[in-house]
């Protein structure tokens, strides 16, 4: 029987080296886990995008570069997090995540919008712009 690896490589690199490794940016999106959820998402001010994903998920791998681009483009306006659902099934269950990738938007620790599936970048940008727009 194979032993389960407790953390993804990007999570380990981020924990030990921060968002850069050897001067190279590892990720624009911050890994989040059950243990850091309340601090990183629940108590975050402003808009937070959480990408619920898994290593084995093909569509998740397709949307990952788009999520990274959005994290760069909206740096300072949007906090982008990534949650591995295999490593953190409790959080995925808490928010009823049944399909991945699911991109869930939070404000004040509460979900405010959701996008399911590997959708085009424009759909995600439209959702972000709408959520960042001042209330009319």
Annotate each language-model stretch with its function:
Residues 5-26:
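Short, Lys/Arg-enriched N-terminal segments with co-localized hydrophobic residues
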Residues 29-48, 89:
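A short beta-strand-turn-helix
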Residues 45-47, 64-83:
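Conserved helix-turn-beta segment immediately C-terminal to the redox Cys motif
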Residues 46, 52-56, 99:
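Short pre-active-site segment immediately N-terminal to redox-active cysteine/selenocysteine motifs
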Residues 52-66:
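Conserved redox-active cysteine motifs that mediate thiol-disulfide chemistry
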Residues 83-92:
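Structural microenvironment flanking redox-active thiols in thiol-disulfide oxidoreductases
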Residues 99, 104-136:
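Non-catalytic, surface beta->alpha helical segment in thiol-disulfide oxidoreductase systems
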């Amino acid at each position: 029987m194979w032993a389960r690896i407790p953390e993804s490589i990007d999570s380990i690199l981020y924990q030990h080296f921060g968002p850069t490794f050897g001067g190279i940016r590892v990720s624009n999106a911050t890994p989040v886990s059950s243990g850091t959820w309340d601090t990183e998402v629940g108590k975050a001010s402003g808009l937070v995008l959480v990408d619920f994903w898994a290593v084995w998920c093909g569509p998740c791998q397709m949307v990952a570069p788009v999520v990274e681009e959005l994290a760069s483009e909206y740096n300072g306006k949007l906090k982008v997090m990534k949650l591995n659902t295999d490593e953190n099934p409790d959080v995925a269950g808490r928010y009823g995540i049944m399909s991945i990738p699911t991109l869930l938007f939070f404000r004040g620790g509460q979900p405010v919008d959701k996008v399911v599936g590997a959708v085009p970048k424009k759909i995600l940008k439209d959702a972000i712009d709408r959520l960042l727009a001042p209330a009319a």
